[in-house]
Amino acid sequence: MAELTTLARPYAKAAFEHAQAHQQLANWSAMLGLAAAVSQDDTMQRMLKAPRVTSAQKATTFIEVCGEKFDAKAQNFIHVVAENDRLPLLPEIAELFDLYKAEQEKSVDVDVTSAFALNQEQQDKLAKVLSARLGREVRLHAAEDASLIGGVVIRAGDLVIDGSVRGKIAKLAEALKS
């Protein structure tokens, strides 16, 4: 994964810098998201791996599949990525682009997993507290996992806060073992 990220980084950075300079971050994010989804299609993956298909043919086919969703600059970007045989890296490129975009917008995606469904009021309160703690706008994504028994697990980038009963039991069990 780290190697793929290293290979994808220059493309993501170039796309981000272009999109930022032209105030098109949302458009490019959507375009790269579509490109990532198309590149993960089984039929498209077979075509991308086919040794007899040239990079120009791969780019042209890719652009045709995406239709009018790509402007001229985006099509050129796909051609450059294809020339360097990096179309399979589009999911990583899109992910890095979105990280750069979030950093620019001072926002962060936060995944909150709870044992029981959180109502909208609880989600809003949690988002407000996390926003104050992280110093960023928080986009909250809530999920349920009954195996937590109670409490929540919060993931925001590299930060993980495990306030679940399952996590506390695991820590207690580890302490008893040592």
From Swiss-Prot:
It is a peripheral membrane protein. One of its GO terms (cellular component) is plasma membrane. Pfam families: OSCP. GO terms for molecular function: proton-transporting ATP synthase activity, rotational mechanism. Keywords: ATP synthesis, Cell inner membrane, Cell membrane, CF(1), Hydrogen ion transport, Ion transport, Membrane, Transport. Signal peptide: none annotated. Gene3D superfamilies: N-terminal domain of the delta subunit of the F1F0-ATP synthase. F-type ATPases have 2 components, F(1) - the catalytic core - and F(0) - the membrane proton channel. F(1) has five subunits: alpha(3), beta(3), gamma(1), delta(1), epsilon(1). F(0) has three main subunits: a(1), b(2) and c(10-14). The alpha and beta chains form an alternating ring which encloses part of the gamma chain. F(1) is attached to F(0) by a central stalk formed by the gamma and epsilon chains, while a peripheral stalk is formed by the delta and b chains. Belongs to the ATPase delta chain family. F(1)F(0) ATP synthase produces ATP from ADP in the presence of a proton or sodium gradient. F-type ATPases consist of two structural domains, F(1) containing the extramembraneous catalytic core and F(0) containing the membrane proton channel, linked together by a central stalk and a peripheral stalk. During catalysis, ATP synthesis in the catalytic domain of F(1) is coupled via a rotary mechanism of the central stalk subunits to proton translocation. This is ATP synthase subunit delta. The gene is atpH.
